[in-house]
Amino acid sequence: MKIFTSTQIHELDKYTIDHEPVSSINLMERAAKAITHCIEAEWSNRTPIVVFAGPGNNGGDALAVARLLADDGYQVSAFLFNIHNKLSNDCALNKKRLIESKRIKQFTEVSVNFEPPTLTPDTVVVDGLFGSGLNKPLTGGFAAMVKYLNSSPAKVVSIDIPSGLICEDNTYNISANILKADLTLTLQQKKLSMLMADNQKYLGRLKVLDIRLSPEYIQNTDCRYRILEENDIRGIMRPRDDFAHKGSMGHALLIAGSYGMAGASILATKACLRAGAGKVTVHSPKRNYDIMQISVPEAIQQMDPEETLFSHPVDTEPYNALGIGPGLGSNETTAIALIAQIRRSTCPLVIDADAINILSSHRAWMQQLPKDIILTPHPKELDRLAGTTSSCCYERLMKASELAERLQAYILLKGHYSALCLPNGHIDFNSTGNSGMATAGSGDVLTGIITALLARGYDAPSACRIGMYLHGLAGDLAAKDLGKESLIAGDIINYLPKAFLRMED
């Protein structure tokens, strides 16, 4: 699914109107019918409905919904806020249609003073104040209206996007002036701001309504953002060769685990094997030898000369991919070995966890990273890499994207919607995964999966896309059977086979 900017959304509407062809008012009616259908599926016609409509096309949608609900026997009160005595053409036409229908319980056009209605826990508020065209924080009376609605006990359904939430960048927005919906019915596509963790409290449940906007425009229009879905991943996964052998399935090298952190190397290694690498070698301190041999007998153990830490780089000539960082520690000896390892590596690289933290502490080394390297930071690790703390998720995402462009690297910013920032400035969001995966070791598992895919011959962007999708899918399948509360990283590994099977169906 592509994610268009607010400007592209406007252009998509216009293209649909011009090329379907369909009039703008009929397109608005189409959207209103889809919204009305969802509301009627949730609440019976005994539910009191209060509609708040703004002066633009979002308000026009809301007025059309008010009319359709009233036609279906709902008791509807509608308030149209026309402070500047200027309505969009379609909003004005839907106002006329609503009044002429004569089925609405109450219609009030507000131009100066507003006496808000009493809202009870049984009331459903339809929010059509502002939509995806909003480009600045709400102020004045509209901000006061949002605060009033947020303090009310009523259920709130937002049309397209909660009023006050900006489609993309909310860095300088005012949280108190953004409506908190219980249900958001967004039209055609999710908006970028809906993928940011700090905006989830405004959305409630989120549903995407297909209102049949031009598929031709959607397909042919390049956009910076997209959400990866199952068909996208199926399209880049290769069928397994029936004549494959362990030599043809790739040899992965993992440099992971300091003393006391052998668990990270175990998790990464098991995940690497489960993701289909033909052979996996693990380079770890001497003290980890016994536990590694016992825990992952399928892997080849390679011991560092040091007892407790990574101290010497490894010749990567025999390997098809290298993953480095899980449980590595940040000892200065390890730091020096890390940069030496990066300099001499001849195979594709995945940098994670402590290896990222070491680079953050030695920022000059980042300029020595090879092109197409993969880094998989969580939000705080990304802030350390960027050198500044981000005030919001959007700001952090932009920093990750800028860093990916500057380094010509692939930066996979982990989160609920993990974001793969590409060297060309584009960003792919993952659509799988759940909150149960917020557990120690989950990132180590992801590193193992991506390293395996690189070793198997996938290029960096494909390995990242497939890797994060399968990682999340395995977590979803595990959560379905085990629940989210007790999910651990090992469960993700155990459900990787089912994730692969799902993609083979």
Question: Where would I find each of the regions flagged by the language model?
Answer:
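Nucleotide and nucleotide-moiety/phosphate-recognizing core
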Residues: 36-129, 137-159, 337, 345
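Internal gly/pro-rich beta-alpha loop/helix module
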Residues: 122-124, 129-223
